[in-house]
């Protein structure tokens, strides 16, 4: 029996499934959920609910390919860190279930495909924004900022804000002020979201030598920063109300008050020296962003009268 025949026989249904799941894990599907939560509302706001469904579908497909490519290349660059941290030790490259070379090729193919898809199905600007996002996330955040500064997620988080820009540009072919405000909402939301999780896994970051803020600062300093960025997030969502109807404005105000209460509770608990549960803020921050952007989508789909 030849080597080729033995390799073909070794591809059992179980191995095929395991390999598929390993490559899927490289793309970090849960991270891609942010794309869905923010891109559709941005597109609906750009044209007040009259967007072609096919354009939305094409933008989502291209955006998901871009996010998958960025996440895969991130896994390649972070393979050494992932092996050390308990939270990431089961990732495919950390466990060597996918060869590094194959993961790199997979990530590059996804990147090129995302650019071509967005360029051909939407416009050149959206494709270029996707490639710029991937380059920024991999080279600026992952390879430069993440290992050198405690403010890594502040500036590196800009990559996670780009889906709204891509969605807006896919509809209009331009970038206008509401898109920039949505960018800032996610930009300010990212530090509280990420640092709350990092507080739970700060020992992991210390062991890996990653200067995430909770790993190098006191809990009081971290929660103070979380509080500041939470306020900035909520205030920015209210600025966006100028371009929306009353529904979004009301939901942004109520959800913002709820988000602020949770951030203040975390800060107050740390200040009093009480046991705190930062993971709760991390989980609820996801719900907060989803509620705000879902309200934006509904408001835009209904084409409610805007203030401006």
From Swiss-Prot:
Carbon 2 of the heme B porphyrin ring is defined according to the Fischer nomenclature. GO terms for cellular component: plasma membrane. It comes from Mycolicibacterium smegmatis (strain ATCC 700084 / mc(2)155) (Mycobacterium smegmatis). It catalyses: heme b + (2E,6E)-farnesyl diphosphate + H2O = Fe(II)-heme o + diphosphate. The chain crosses the membrane at residues 31-51, 53-73, 102-122, 124-144, 149-169, 170-190, 242-262, 288-308. Signal peptide: none annotated. The lineage of its organism: Bacteria, Bacillati, Actinomycetota, Actinomycetes, Mycobacteriales. Converts heme B (protoheme IX) to heme O by substitution of the vinyl group on carbon 2 of heme B porphyrin ring with a hydroxyethyl farnesyl side group. Gene3D superfamilies: UbiA prenyltransferase (1.10.357.140). Its main location: membrane. One of its GO terms (biological process) is heme O biosynthetic process. It is a multi-pass membrane protein. This is Protoheme IX farnesyltransferase. GO terms for molecular function: protoheme IX farnesyltransferase activity. The keyword Membrane applies. Keywords: Cell membrane, Heme biosynthesis, Membrane, Transferase, Transmembrane, Transmembrane helix. It is an enzyme of class 2 (transferase). The keyword Cell division does not apply.
